Amino acid sequence: MNIFNKLKQDIIAASRQLYNNQEIANNATIETPKDNFNGDLSSNIAMIIAAKENISPREVALKFKEILITLPYIASIEIAGPGFINFTIKAETWQIAIKDILQHEEKFCEIDIDKSRNINIEYVSANPTGPMHIGHARGAVYGDVLARILQKVGYFVTKEYYVNDAGSQINDLVSTVLLRYREALGETITIPDGLYPGEYLIPLGQILAEEYGNKLLMMDEEERFKIVKNFAVEKMLDLNRKDLADLGIKHDIFFSEQSLHDKCAIEETVKLLTGMGLIYEGILPPPKGKVHDEWDNRVQKLFKSTNYGDSQDRPIEKADGSWSYFASDLAYAKDKIDRGVSHLIYVLGADHSGYVKRIEAIVKALGKEQVKVDVKICQLVNFVENGVPVKMSKRLGSFASVQDVNHEVGKDIIRFMMLTRQNDKPLDFDLVKVKEQSRENPIFYVQYAHVRTISILSKARELMPESYNNFEACKYDLSLLSSEEEIAIIKLLASWTKTLETSAKYFEPHRIAFYLINLASKFHSMWNFGKEHSDYRFIIESNKELTTARLALATAIQKVIASGLEVIGVEPMDRM
């Protein structure tokens, strides 16, 4: 039984009985209070109803108490503060959670959500001009784990990578590859400032030389550019796909910006928005602090993004008359919406924080307020070694690419550590501490808990085969799990689905990592307590029944840790 869902449904039923109102009760929350003295679960239903009915929250709370106290799983109810209803749940109800995890895991993880939503998450979208820089890893992991969470709770999710293959950086890439091609033909070259000096493009020049000889030099410039561009972009995308695959990340769609130009999607989108009265010709005022004489005050085609909360209207053309990057964003959003997407999520780096309002404006306009949009910013990662900052520069011989760091610490450590802080907060990644086998290393701490549960079962099979066989046959008395430490762990296990639901609701994958660290901590504490107090050991040779029950507890811990690591994309370890 999912106790959070069960209590929510019973509150809705009580609301229907008391106030003939189910819809408003759907907005009520069921949370775990921060302080134990406020009970096990708490709801704000009384304050929601009171605001609607214009009556006292405590009066409403008392009416709910009269009905809900009769529920068989409720031990007591207290009214606190302005009208919070705090519930204490009977111990046997928590103990049933162990049985549900072991015997009905799929049903236990069921979450009551609107599963009709079609969600598109765009993340990474690095320019295809070279190996993926480690700076992209946080957004890559955040986006990928968020997609996994949303899929886990039942949404249909598309993971998308927007390929920026139509801008000036691609022109610079082509120019560099052509120089490497000439070099492969025997010319002495110099890579000018502003191009890409990395050695990773040398093999591309060699491949072109082997395939074309000097034929590319004989072609007209436009034909040569097209051939080299298609070749270089595809090779760089292959490189990026491999970097992502090595992190356990696979996108469903790689969408080409160039395709928007090729099929005149930008023109069509501008025509649509013009018909909606959202495109006009005007002069943008200079930004604050900018002198008028230094500002380009030409007449431009502008999108009325201020209609939707943006700080200024946005140009859709550059000074030379070509489409702006913003114009591509307009057409790209329309393409997604035309595919039937009902919720767009953009995951951007810290350097794109200024794009939030303009992207929201685009989707609100094209989606006609029917399509949801969220723009999530991932702050910078500061790499350190024992607390000392590491300069992420290839020229200095330090880590620069995803491949470098992946080779040094492995994908599982990268994925977990990128979730040890909320995405909009800077993160310190200590390249030394993440490899330590200590409590200070969260990924080790969680994996060690998983390994310990396996060790408990293995040892029980050897030392107490009767207890182990009874556990395997589901012959255990869960009421024996009654100590304060055991109940605390069981309550945390029972809140796993709530953690998943909250992570999905607020787009906060770090909650999964935090939950796993908390669960591992409580488990290790009980294990260590058992070293000094034999009654708390998981295997007690003089008490077969309690041992059988604790094998069930250890297995439930193992299953939930494995489930959490699976959501994060980390392989649970069986031994260390």
From Swiss-Prot:
Question: Keyword annotations for this protein?
Answer: Aminoacyl-tRNA synthetase, ATP-binding, Cytoplasm, Ligase, Nucleotide-binding, Protein biosynthesis
Which EC class does it fall in? ligase
Q: Carries keyword rRNA-binding? A: no
Reading the lineage from the top rank, the first entry is Bacteria
Q: Show the GO MF annotations.
A: arginine-tRNA ligase activity; ATP binding
Reactions performed catalytically: tRNA(Arg) + L-arginine + ATP = L-arginyl-tRNA(Arg) + AMP + diphosphate
Output the Gene Ontology cellular-component terms. cytoplasm
Q: Where is this motif: 'HIGH' region?
A: 126-136
Give EC number(s), comma-separated.
6.1.1.19
- Biological process GO terms, please? arginyl-tRNA aminoacylation
Q: Has keyword Cell cycle?
A: no
Q: How does it assemble?
A: Monomer.
Please identify the protein, giving its name as recorded.
Arginine--tRNA ligase
Lineage of the source organism?
A: Bacteria, Pseudomonadati, Pseudomonadota, Alphaproteobacteria, Rickettsiales
